[in-house]
């Protein structure tokens, strides 16, 4: 995808339509590019600039000050996220950058009330707490989302193939039993695979996958006809 307004809107609709219309608590998509915060490089660059007299130019006669490409890329992404949130104001749908990594930025589109309901269910809350997440108190949901983002960034720093922590499935509204069975079976021996790997109630899961596909198809068609993100949130999708 391209980092422009239209491209970002299309990505939201392509990957997050079920959340836009309210049948899924959250969706996640990746924006390709290097969005990692290169602290050492930035620090070194700032030290070099501080040692250089104002207005000093290099041997070529050009200014030696350089813009960090990842910083510019992050600024552009932040502007697009802010624009999307303005478009979605009053709809109960929020957009935020979940994690900034060298292999791409993960953008979370979510409905706070639906997501809080999912994560505060007794079994999910107990499991999340055992994994180090806040599950109660003022601001617990935003704290949990921020904690997930840090884990995703740290995993990518430690390994280029760091993968996703298992609790991502709970944030995305996957059935609790399927998330835990995925962990137990190490991703093997599933009944079917769609948005997630299914270990129980295959019929219900397949119906859900089909509904998500219809939702995405209809939302993409409406976007193509000029509908706004806010207008898509009022759509209804047959069960």
Kindly give the residue locations of the regions a language model identified.
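Intrinsically disordered, low-complexity terminal tails and inter-domain linkers enriched
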Residues: 37-72, 157-160
């Amino acid at each position: 995808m391209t980092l422009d307004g239209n491209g970002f809107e299309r990505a939201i609709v392509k990957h997050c339509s079920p959340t836009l219309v309210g049948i899924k608590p959250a969706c996640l998509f990746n924006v390709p590019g290097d969005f990692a915060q290169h602290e050492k490089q930035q620090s070194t660059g700032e030290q070099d600039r501080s040692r250089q007299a104002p207005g000093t130019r290099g041997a070529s006669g050009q200014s030696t000050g350089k813009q960090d490409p990842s910083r510019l890329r992050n600024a552009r992404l932040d502007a697009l996220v802010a624009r999307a949130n303005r478009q979605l104001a009053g709809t109960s749908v929020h957009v935020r950058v979940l994690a900034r990594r060298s292999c791409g930025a993960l953008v979370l589109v979510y409905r706070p009330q639906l997501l809080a309901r999912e994560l505060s269910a007794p079994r999910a809350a107990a499991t999340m707490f055992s994994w180090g997440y806040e599950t109660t108190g003022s601001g617990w949901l935003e704290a949990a989302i921020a904690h997930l983002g840090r884990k995703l960034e740290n995993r990518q720093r430690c390994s280029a193939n760091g993968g996703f922590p298992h609790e991502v499935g709970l944030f995305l509204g996957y059935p609790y039993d399927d998330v835990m069975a995925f962990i137990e079976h190490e991703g093997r021996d599933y009944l079917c695979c769609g948005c997630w790997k299914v270990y129980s109630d295959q019929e219900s899961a397949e119906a859900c996958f089909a509904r998500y596909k219809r939702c995405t198809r209809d939302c993409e068609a409406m976007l193509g006809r000029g509908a706004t993100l806010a207008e898509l949130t009022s759509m209804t999708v047959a069960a």
